[in-house]
Amino acid sequence: MTPFRFRAVPALLAALLAAPVAAQPSRTSSRPDGENPAAAFAASHSPATSGRHRTSEEEDARRDHAETHRRGFQQHDRPQFVFSSKENRFSFSLGGFVALRAAYDAGGIVENIDFVTYDIPVAGNYATRQKLTLDASTSRLFLKAIANTRAVGRVVIYLDGDFRGGAANSYTPRLHSAYVSLLGLTLGRDVTTFCDLEAAPATVDFQGPNAYNFNFATLVRYERSFAEGRLSFGVAAEMPVVSGTYGEGFDAIPQRVPDIPFYLQYAWGGDRSSHIRASAVVRNMYLHDLTRKSDTSLTGWGVQFSGTIRCCDPLRLFMNGVYGKGITPYIQDLTGSGLDFTPCPRDETRIRTMPMWGWQAAAQIALTPRLFLSGGYSTVRVQRSHGFYAADEYKRGQYVFGNVFYTIAPRCKVAGEYLYGSRRDMAAGKGHANRVNVMLQYGF
């Protein structure tokens, strides 16, 4: 990071053009974004990497932003530039990256920019054999501000977004996160509390393994760690998103009760880079019964076990397993599928939540500090509940991937990936797809 004071803002463009490329710092972990924040700060901001004297305020500002940097699935690198006020009472950073993905589907396609196995056509035809895709809509911008206050200590304000807000290829801006964090509280929009950000490996595919749950929610969350960072827990109230099949006997109405996800995590290792986590979520979904002319509700619930384990210096493992009823927002492949609940096939005046489960496991090996390989398998299944509502209802999806990432320069990387997926319906219809992805990404 190359910090500046507010008074130096007019010289920012000149500094950007004149700044030399720093040597890539050595890693202490096989995870591409898994460095200890304090160690990474010391390595990348030592006097040897600086061309000018830095004040204590600037050092403190960089440390604040390093310590609050979040690592994990689809997270950005630490910012290159940090702006600080006098005595570091307030600082902010700007950053992001430009990402270009190219994909080619053959032997079956996915009707989505991302590799979503739910969207694999079951009855293939001449239009579902091959497809070319070029996409830069996941390029990202972010702003982080940190205030060091006497009353409540450190306050973090964060916003980020990409260009996936409209139809495919429209490049409409989309807000990902917008929250303020203080005293263990997070208020705003962020990744759902049910998601374990470090339980999935890096993928070129923006969607990631189909049993994972990288979704966002508007929330109020409380988190706390203790026992020297070995133990942590979190609980939240999140705005519910219901996706059900109502049939002829029911109708949608506004929701009244937030989803309640919570977790307990145990971490180990010198930098706490390995952990296991147990999570759960409870939901209460409201709908209107047209037959009885009254409102009713269904209870959804889910449990998850997840984690990441650094087995040795170059090898890291990832996994998560989830089971529940009526939890489509918390399983990647089922989000928006209409399977939180469906009418009973024998009596459409009755309705029930759908049981569902999924799991994924992956490994990542760092061949050098700049080069790593990943591979894994993921599957999702929707169980029958007294039969099935429709013959073309989703039953099972499989997601297999292998990739290679190479860091050309500290903020530039390229990657290649192969993906195989399949979808099976309740009535045994099946489709499959193959995709080759390549990516070029440059951060700033």
Task: Specify the residue positions occupied by each region the protein language model found.
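Bacterial N-terminal signal peptides
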Residues: P10-A19
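Outer membrane beta-barrel
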Residues: F83-D114, N125-S243, R256-V257, P261, ...
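Sequence/structural signature of outer-membrane beta-barrel proteins
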Residues: D105, N148, D162-A168, F194-D196, ...
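Surface-exposed extracellular loop regions of Gram-negative outer-membrane beta-barrel proteins
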Residues: S139-L159, Y263-L290, A366, L371-S378, ...
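Outer-membrane beta-barrel "beta-signal"
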Residues: Y406-I408, H432-F444
